[in-house]
């Protein structure tokens, strides 16, 4: 609405950059969403290792964080963190652009659903607390399909506004809300 109009009238460069980024993100997300999950995970392995070598500051931060957590990090463990982080990132397009029914089929084993079912049967409320690393968007989509009511997720919007719009479009469909 009005905010978009203000951007267009007062700062055409910002509007053009936002539009370009939105189109670019949407294009690549749709491309990745069409790929088999196994291929995305293999790609994540390669990209995660590349990021490990290219991002010295991030690599050092992971080593420091692991030491702070009382772990003895080695190169293999830190590379695994990068691979898993990229894997989670490459799963986002799947969560945002595939049909919920096809996402549901990706889950081959679910542990602990009996606790959710017991709470539902007892008429109790539910609060899911999930880590911010991993397949939380895929899991949220899966859970929202199985619940008899909408699933509302809270999150901190990304700094890149175009990415937030793509995320909202992907999360707020079916029985998902933010």
Model regions and ranges:
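Short, positively charged and aromatic/hydrophobic N-terminal segments
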Residues: 6, 10-18
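Membrane-anchoring hydrophobic helices of lipid-metabolizing enzymes
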Residues: 17-130, 164-169
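Residue-level recognition of conserved structural "scaffold" positions that shape functional pockets
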Residues: 8-11, 33, 141, 147
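Catalytic core of membrane glycerolipid acyltransferases/transacylases, capturing the structured
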Residues: 89, 122-178
């Amino acid at each position: 609405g009005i905010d978009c109009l203000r951007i267009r009238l007062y700062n055409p460069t910002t509007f053009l950059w936002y539009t370009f980024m939105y189109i670019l993100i949407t294009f690549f997300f749709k491309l990745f969403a069409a790929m088999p999950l196994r291929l995305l995970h293999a790609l994540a392995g390669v990209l995660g290792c590349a990021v490990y070598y290219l991002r010295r500051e991030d690599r050092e931060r992971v080593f420091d964080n692991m030491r702070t957590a009382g772990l003895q990090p080695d190169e293999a463990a830190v590379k695994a963190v990068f691979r898993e982080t990229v894997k989670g990132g490459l799963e986002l397009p799947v969560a945002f652009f595939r049909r919920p029914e096809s996402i549901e089929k990706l889950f081959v084993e679910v542990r602990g659903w009996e606790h959710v079912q017991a709470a539902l049967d007892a008429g109790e409320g539910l609060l899911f607390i999930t880590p911010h690393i991993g397949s939380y968007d895929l899991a949220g989509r899966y859970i929202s399909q199985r619940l008899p009511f909408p699933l509302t997720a809270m999150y901190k919007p990304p700094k890149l506004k175009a990415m937030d719009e793509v995320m909202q479009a992907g999360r707020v469909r079916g029985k998902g809300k933010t």
